[in-house]
């Protein structure tokens, strides 16, 4: 519902999807054949199944990444892109998530890092990933909860009990944390600059980039880089978000 409300159902046919292993997709947290290319192929299969010649794509954070990847692969099927909270799948963005946000949210990061034994804190991603893919729920569920709570604590400009509680949901936390760690350790299954280098494939189509200036999970520097590579797109910075 949160995503549907951006659009008037009297004017648009709204299609909302949950990617492999996340949300209502089953099995939850499954990593089998779970790569960026598989997700792009799933989107294309869905378009064909619904009998759509083309569609607009709307996505935020990782959703912005996936929309860009799809537009690079299938520009002829896109009418336009509406993107918010840009994530370009580059190593500095992953490093920022894992360690950089401690500069703004040190207390949240301490809870995140200190969940691991001291000897494992030199490589948070590797050691969280190892726990998150462990088949034992007594190992992967607590790690997923801590990961999701960290992201939730850093995801809003002002503290939000509602946001924190939504990230603490066990089902959401496992789908979120396990899949994020899986993609992070595999470099998001794409070359470092793939999304920026692919702008030429879709720069002719309408585009809107919306970015909160104080987005901590997806810092503004990524939206700025995309806007510079794609100056034809409308670029809106929300000053107090």
Range-by-range predicted roles:
Residues 7-26:
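Conserved alpha/beta-hydrolase
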Residues 37-56:
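Conserved acidic catalytic loop of the alpha/beta-hydrolase fold
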Residues 39, 57-59, 84, 210:
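Short beta-strand immediately N-terminal to the catalytic nucleophile in serine-hydrolase-like folds
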Residues 64-75, 81:
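Short glycine-enriched nucleophile-adjacent loop
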Residues 76-128:
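A catalytic-pocket lid/entrance helix-loop region that shapes and gates access to the active site
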Residues 191, 216-222:
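Conserved alpha/beta-hydrolase "acid-adjacent" motif
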Residues 202-203, 209-211, 215:
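Short beta-strand/loop motif that positions the catalytic acidic residue
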Residues 220-240:
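Catalytic histidine neighborhood in serine/cysteine hydrolases
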């Amino acid at each position: 519902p949160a995503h549907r409300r951006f659009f008037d159902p009297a004017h648009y046919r709204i299609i909302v999807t949950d990617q492999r292993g996340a949300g209502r997709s089953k099995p939850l947290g499954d990593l089998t054949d779970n790569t960026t290319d598989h997700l792009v192929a799933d989107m294309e299969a869905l378009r064909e199944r619904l009998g759509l010649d083309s569609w607009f794509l709307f996505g935020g954070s990782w959703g912005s990444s996936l929309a860009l990847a799809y537009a690079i692969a299938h520009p002829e099927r896109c009418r336009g892109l509406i993107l918010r909270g840009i994530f370009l799948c580059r190593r500095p963005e992953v490093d920022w998530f894992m360690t950089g946000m401690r500069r703004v949210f040190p207390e949240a990061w301490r809870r995140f890092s200190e969940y691991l034994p001291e000897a494992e804190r030199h490589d948070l991603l590797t050691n969280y990933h190892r726990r998150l893919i462990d088949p034992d729920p007594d190992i992967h569920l607590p790690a997923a909860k801590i990961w999701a709570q960290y992201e939730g604590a850093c995801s809003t400009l002002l503290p939000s009990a509602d946001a924190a509680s939504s990230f603490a949901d066990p089902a959401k936390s496992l789908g979120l944390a396990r899949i994020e760690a899986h993609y992070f350790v595999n470099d998001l299954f794409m070359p470092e600059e793939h999304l920026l280098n692919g702008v030429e494939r879709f720069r002719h189509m309408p585009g809107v980039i919306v970015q909160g200036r104080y987005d901590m999970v997806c810092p503004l520097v990524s939206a700025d880089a995309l806007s510079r590579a794609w100056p034809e797109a409308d670029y809106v910075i929300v000053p107090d978000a």
